[in-house]
Amino acid sequence: MNQKKISLFGFFALTASMVLTVYEYPTFATSKLHLVFFLLLGGLLWFLPVALCAAEMATVEGWKNGGIFSWVSQTLGERFGFAAIFFQWFQITVGFVTMIYFILGALSYVLNFQALNTDPLIKFIGLLIIFWGLTFSQLGGTQRTAKLVKAGFVVGIVIPSIILFGLAAAYFIGGNPIEIPINKHAFVPDFSQVSTLVVFVSFILAYMGVEASASHINELENPKRNYPLAMILLVILAISLDAIGGFSVAAVIPQKDLSLSAGVIQTFQTLILHFNHHLGWLVKVIALMIAFGVMGEVSSWVVGPSRGMFAAAQRGLLPKFLRKTNTHEVPVPLVMIQGIIVTLWGAVLTFGGGGNNLSFLVAISLTVVIYLVGYLLFFIGYFVLIYKKQNLKRTYNVPGKRVGKTIIAGIGFLLSIFALFISFVPPASIAKNETHTYQMILLISFVVTAILPFIVYELHDKRGHDTIEEPRHFKARDVNPAIYPAARGEHHIIKKEEHILKH
């Protein structure tokens, strides 16, 4: 019996959660009106190439069940396939830090306790309490917290975003002063000033993860027409909402006063008190809502990305103990290792960066460069597919035959290289005496991370460790649309009696 196909709107709804990245608005705001240019650049020349190339790879006969691990393994070999899935997982160990910084910024306002956002030691302790609390809450199974994640998305992300957009619109319509220049020269960045371009990496981060939804193209009605249309609609929505959100922050908060972890709360405070000085309590309510929403997002990331590493363990590429799950189908050893790594990153970034904007910027840049290495492998794998494996059957093709495919993938590949290198240039928004710290933390962390999966792959004896269970890919019906696509993971965790942890 043929499975019911999903409609254009249904497919769009599966991916739409990625367009609301409220905790990135302050970083977008540091680019002032350049944010529109960067959103267009990233959306049209990076997001769309990734989405289209991923869709073609997802429909290749025999590749439909494996995601990026399978795509890269089939084109570049198992070693690089493991590296790709490793980078896709490892980036979130840094990403947790930026999300929790944002939560701490909101809570510091609610509790009127600024040290929670500025004192490195207190900030680190707060990070540990939130992260480990949310991690342990997930050990009972993700089904228990699915409703919490949905509620967090609506209450803590969607509603505050609507309120922010409404307040900002009223502020602008009222003819109130705007903190950034608005003229025809303000839209396009000065390419001779490299330090002003580095913020582009945060815009790339906003678009990352779409390949996780590309796999569902096999369930989509008329994919040749509907998939590109869904992605174009998604880009338009992302550009519109992120431009409004970033501009709202930039317009009301002076650049010198902008906190990257608490900038959204600063914006709510400025706008609400502008209209009514007696509504300070409302700012705290909204800050609490946002903290709740981002906590829900953090909890959704705890298990999802580790599913890819669990699939690698099932294929015998990691030690046997990493195949273990508890009775709730949570890969506890992997999640605990993830937690230890997050703790180490939290210490490095919080104490190394002083717990201020520098820590936040390094964390964002490091997240992006780790993820980008995985995307470079993805694009190289795609080139191998279209030039050396062109005879493989597939149900979707990137438009333009081989020439069009090369141009589209080439643009995405080159922009990935540009974003990777530009990440190591200190941003214009940090003080000159902090530039060396920024570069050293980022460079050392990146080099260690880049070689780590290859060391792990070589050191583990893979002989005799046969695949114990072929990974089973999520269907659209299994997906919680309130969860960011990359946070869902792509595979079911198959519980085997002999691999259940004993109490």
Swiss-Prot record:
Transmembrane segments annotated in the record for this chain: 35-55, 153-173, 194-214, 232-252, 366-386, 407-427, 440-460
What does the record give as the reaction this protein catalyses? 4-aminobutanoate(in) + L-glutamate(out) = 4-aminobutanoate(out) + L-glutamate(in)
Q: Which InterPro entries match?
A: AA/rel_permease1, APC_superfamily, Glu_antiport
Q: Where is this gene product found?
A: Cell membrane
Cellular component (GO) terms are:
plasma membrane
Q: Which Pfam families match?
A: AA_permease_2 (PF13520)
One example of the protein's molecular function in GO is: antiporter activity
Positions contributing to L-glutamate binding: 33-43
Q: Which UniProt keywords apply?
A: Amino-acid transport, Antiport, Cell membrane, Membrane, Transmembrane, Transmembrane helix, Transport
User: What kind of membrane protein is this, topologically?
Assistant: Multi-pass membrane protein
UniProt main location, coarse: membrane
Keyword Coiled coil applies:
no
One GO biological process from the UniProt record? Answer: amino acid transport
Homology family? Belongs to the amino acid-polyamine-organocation (APC) superfamily. Glutamate:GABA antiporter (GGA) (TC 2.A.3.7) family.
| Function of the protein | Involved in glutaminase-dependent acid resistance. Exchanges extracellular glutamate (Glu) for intracellular gamma-aminobutyric acid (GABA) under acidic conditions.
PANTHER family cross-referenced by the UniProt entry? AMINO ACID TRANSPORTER-RELATED (PTHR42770), GLUTAMATE_GAMMA-AMINOBUTYRATE ANTIPORTER-RELATED (PTHR42770:SF15)
Query: Which protein are we looking at?
Result: Glutamate/gamma-aminobutyrate antiporter
Provide the species name: Lactococcus lactis subsp. lactis (strain IL1403) (Streptococcus lactis)
